[in-house]
C-alpha cells in the first residue's frame, strides 16, 4: 500500500549524476500517481521552503571528500524545522570491473546530515548511496562510454528497487552495509573538509583555448569563479563539483598537475628548512608541526597559483602550463551524465 502521495526532492549535482537519480525517482513516482517535485539546491531559497507535513522529503547530493559538499551541508543546516519523513541519498564515485560495479564510499555524509535533521525534528527513513560514474576528472580520466552506460543502467534498476520500498513507507538503510569502511575513512573526510578542499579549489585554470564565453562563471553553483585579467580565476570556495570542466565547450578548463609538482618541491624544501631553523620545542609537537606545514603549503599554493594566472596571459607560457596537465590531452576526456536513451540504445 502506498503511504506517500507527495514527494519533494532537493538535489545538488555538478555533472548530472544526482540530477539523473532525481529524474528516475520522479519517473517511478509518476507511475504510482505520486506527485513528485524537484528543486535544485543551487537555486533553492530557504525562506521560501514550505512543505506539507505529509510530503516525503528526499535530499540527494554527490560525495566530495567522503562527505556532502559544503553547499549541501549549508542547505541542510538552514533547512526549516519540521516533522516530515526524510530519505538521504548520495552519488559516490562508482567504477566498473568486468560486470561488477565497484562502490564508492559515503564517509561521514549521512552521519552529519542525520544529526542536523533530527535536531530539527525530522524522521530519517532511509540512507541510500548510488554508485553513479566517478567524475573526479582532476584525479583520473573520464570513464569510457560503455562503462558510463553500464553504471547508469545498473543504478536505474537500483533506484526502481528502492522506490518500490520507499513508496510503501518502508525504511531503507542501505548505508549500514558500509558502516565499517565509512568509520575508517572519517579522518580523511575531516581532513578534506578542513584543508584538502581548498587545495583542490586552486587546481583549476583556463587554458589558452578559453574564448572568454564565461559559461563557467555563470554556471558555477557557488560563484567561485571570477574574471581576473580577462581570464577565469578560481576562488577558495570552489567545491570541485566538476561542472565547469564538464560544460566548457572548448575543453579549456584543466587541472594544474604541473603546478602541484612545483609547489610540492618548494614545500618539502621550505617546510623542512623552517622547522629546522625555528628551534622552538612547541613547533615539534606532531599536531603543531602539521598545522605549520599546512600553512606553509597554503601560502605557496596561493602565491604560485597567482603567478600561474599571470603566465596564462601569454600564449607561449600558457601552452607550456597545459603541456604539464594530464587533463589537457584527449585521452583524459570529460565526464557528464548521459541521457537514458543512450544506455537503453546500447542495451538493445
Where on the chain are the PLM-derived regions?
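Hydrophobic residues within alpha-helices
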Residues: 21-25, 29, 113, 216
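Short gly/ser/thr-rich secondary-structure transition/capping motifs
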Residues: 37-44
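Hydrophobic alpha-helical transmembrane segments
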Residues: 281-299
